[in-house]
Amino acid sequence: MKIVALKEKVKNETRTAITPEVAGLLIKKGYAVTVEKDIGLYAGFLDEEYVAVGTKISSVPLEIISDADIILKVQPSSVTDKYSELEFAKQGAIVVGLLSPYLNHEYIKAAAKKNLTTFAMEFVPRITKAQNMDALSSQSNLVGYRAVIEASYHYTKAFPMMITAAGTISACKTLVLGVGVAGLQAIATAKRLGSIVAGYDVRIATKEQVESLGAKFVSPELQEDLEEESGYASESSADYKAKQEKFLAKIIKGYNIVITTAQIPGKKAPMLVTDKMIESMMYGSVIVDISTSTGGNVEGSEPDKIVTRHGVTIIGLLNLASKIASDSSKLYSKNLYNFLTYALQDGQFNMDDELVRDMLITKDGKIVNYIIREKYESITDNG
């Protein structure tokens, strides 16, 4: 069985789906691995490292893709990409990656039409046996870290309190909105840098997690618990949204750094920080909105841009994981490896396994994942 990966085509995507370490592990299991020349260059992996573990290197993408049984990706190709699996992969080839099926309708439909079997790493279920495959968590962890680093770079003051002969510098105050994997890592990183940190979330269970990191949990009184069985947050009621907005408007002006991480799978990110709130913040404050790919949590934030409103810097950079491409590639590639070793039995994907089926998006020319199929049907029905 031939497993391949090409260089990522998405702008500013510097991660790679196969690291030399994982290539070596796959080869030891009997798979033939081929990657495109310089595939890991921007993540700090040289071709020599791949060759050393037995990987074949090719500078001809068409040759790689047309002969592949399994294609590993970080992000999906565009339907217009040159040498895309959508055009040149053989029918029945398997594609595994962060395919963003909620957003990339054209890709998923084209993959089904091409008769590709696709697995979305976003759909790894949040269960114990799948933890080592959980790419969303591994990447979100690094995104939370990087969000704080970006904030500290654009903030014109120090994070920790410093007492010097020339005077005392006060510690900055950081507020993290949304305490999932990214939010918890943002809290931990800001604490390590010496900031005074608070966390906010609509899920009551996160209070203990925030406090375990030495941060303060802040929330409106009579908090409505919006945690679903999946562990993700659900949408709040109109009444709670109004109460939430009033509460955040009251407290946000006391913070120098705000990190927003709130997302709802398959839906637009909730708006948390209004323009009026931004106007109330201290001049020179910094907001990092890591949810701009799904609409953003901050009014006025723009995808992949840094803007200033009312003297506040708003960072809406996409794909923060690519700013630490080496480590994010190591973790993501290992997630892929763990999924493959779990799902493959005698060279075939075990479609009888519920975990494998949950991740399956297209097969035999059809969109087989009912969540995605219903999502696309609703979009079509609504014009």
Curated annotation (Swiss-Prot):
Pfam families: AlaDh_PNT_C, AlaDh_PNT_N
GO terms (BP aspect): NADPH regeneration
PROSITE patterns per record: ALADH_PNT_1 (PS00836)
EC number: 7.1.1.1
GO molecular function terms attached to this record: NAD+ binding; NADP binding; oxidoreductase activity; proton-translocating NAD(P)+ transhydrogenase activity
Reactions this protein catalyses: NAD(+) + NADPH + H(+)(in) = NADH + NADP(+) + H(+)(out)
Top EC class, one word: translocase
Alphabetical UniProt keywords: NAD, NADP, Nucleotide-binding, Translocase
Listed GO CC annotations: plasma membrane
InterPro entries: AlaDH/PNT_CS1, AlaDH/PNT_N, AlaDH/PNT_NAD(H)-bd, NAD(P)-bd_dom_sf
Binding site for NAD(+): 131-134, 181, 201-203, 231
Family note: Belongs to the AlaDH/PNT family.
Oligomer and partners: Heterotrimer of two alpha chains and a beta (PntB) chain; in Rickettsia, the alpha chain is made of two subunits (PntAA and PntAB) and forms a dimer.
Function: The transhydrogenation between NADH and NADP is coupled to respiration and ATP hydrolysis and functions as a proton pump across the membrane.
Protein name per UniProt: NAD(P) transhydrogenase subunit alpha part 1
Organism: Rickettsia prowazekii (strain Madrid E)
Gene label: pntAA
